[in-house]
């Protein structure tokens, strides 16, 4: 750590030690290296997410779809005005409650069930049993976190692989409901 004044250096060093906020030189190298491809990675994240939204929107197995890139999203206009893209996070409410969610998750191969979101790999989380499991069902419902809610962090894998994975998982939910399959777009 470098500071112009010794007192500032001492104070910053104390906070860095207390909070563990300093990275190693190798961490700094990796950060700088990763910044070079950040724009390209974010572009692929968003393109993949838009492709999945197209597949999910209006599907019989989907009760609701939440992504600010959809014109129907309540935050769409402000997101369009303030952002250069709509991101790679989306939430879906699956039909069929817990059984529908289990069928969907069991059908995924490209997405990993995880609470960590935002990496280059595609991840999915079930908030009712993961991040918000300690909340009562009533508190979750009041917060809009139903048993059918899934949160996705879409990665940079090939879009066709992700679409096929989601389509197969949706087919499992539709089969559970006893409805005919909807063809993928």
Where on the chain are the PLM-derived regions?
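PLP-dependent enzyme catalytic core of the Aspartate aminotransferase-like
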Residues: 41, 106, 122-185
């Amino acid at each position: 750590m470098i500071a112009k004044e010794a007192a500032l250096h001492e104070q910053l060093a104390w906070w860095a030690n207390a909070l563990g906020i300093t990275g190693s030189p190798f961490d700094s190298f990796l950060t700088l290296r990763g910044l070079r491809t950040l724009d390209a990675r974010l572009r692929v994240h968003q393109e993949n997410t838009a492709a999945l939204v197209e597949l999910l929107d209006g599907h019989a197995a989907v009760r609701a779809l939440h992504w600010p890139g959809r014109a129907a999203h309540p935050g769409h206009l402000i997101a369009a005005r303030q952002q250069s893209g709509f991101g790679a996070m989306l939430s879906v409410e699956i039909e069929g409650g817990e059984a529908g969610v289990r069928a969907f998750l069991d059908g995924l191969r490209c997405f990993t069930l995880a609470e960590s979101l935002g990496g280059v790999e595609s991840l999915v989380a079930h908030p009712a049993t993961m991040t918000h499991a300690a909340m009562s069902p009533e508190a979750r419902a009041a917060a809009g976190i139903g048993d059918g809610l899934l949160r996705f962090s879409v990665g940079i894998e090939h879009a066709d692989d992700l679409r096929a994975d989601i389509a197969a998982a949706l087919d499992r939910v539709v089969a559970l409901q006893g409805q005919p399959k909807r063809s993928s777009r």
